[in-house]
Amino acid sequence: MGDEDETPFSAADSLRLIEEQRSTTQRSLTPDPRLLYWPWGIAWLVGFGLLFLRFGPNGRVFVDMPVWLPLSTLYFLMIVAFVVSGVAGARASRHMSGVSSLTGALYGWSWFLGFAGFIALAVRLSPHLSDEWNGLLWAAGSIGVVGLMYLNGGAIWRSRDLFVLGLWITAVNILGVIVGPGWHSLIISLGAGAAMIISGTFAHLKPGRWF
């Protein structure tokens, strides 16, 4: 009688241990979404926000600040974001093997090659553009690469949420290009930057839906 009473408890304990092990394995294979999204969100929110305040539509200056400050801040924060998200992804990929490891590595190289290709094009075109359109080229082009890579990531890992994020970033970027220099910075700051922060928070609260 005593053994029969203990059996359900043993089964429940086994299920609990299995679930804990599954959760631990999932956490080890999945990078912290906050480290993947928040750094980029902060970089865009702050960096493009400063660009809008200093280089507004039609050359308007909303806040007088040194010319070098907005771009320097944006580039610095984007470098930090690239390093932080790259390290987070690399740590997670160490536990992968086979096809999953190869997919992650190829996806990482796609980021590098995508930006390299865009930079090569932008460097060639920049001397032929005015300052405001040159700024739009670099801003819209870099955001375009990011949006495309998130779309690809959503397709590769069959993540609807990740694909929707890429779609949103792409749509916001297109809208910014249509309205033109100055306004593009504001739209990216609030639309894309805030979206990245919200997405990182959502992915952290709802693990397992993004990767």
Q: What is each stretch, according to the model?
A:
Residues 30-120:
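Selected alpha-helical membrane-embedding segments in polytopic membrane proteins
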Residues 23-27, 86-98, 163, 203-211:
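Juxtamembrane membrane-water interface segments of multi-pass membrane proteins
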Residues 52-65, 123-135, 179-183:
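Helix-coil boundary and interhelical linker segments in multi-pass alpha-helical membrane proteins
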Residues 44-51, 78-85, 115-119, 143-150, ...:
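Helical transmembrane-bundle signal
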Residues 34-37, 41, 75, 112, ...:
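Residues within membrane-spanning alpha-helices of integral membrane proteins
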Residues 146-211:
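Terminal transmembrane helical module of multi-pass membrane proteins
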Residues 1-33:
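N-terminal juxtamembrane cytosolic/stromal segments of multi-pass membrane proteins
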Residues 99, 103, 107-162:
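Membrane-proximal helix-loop-helix units in multi-pass membrane proteins
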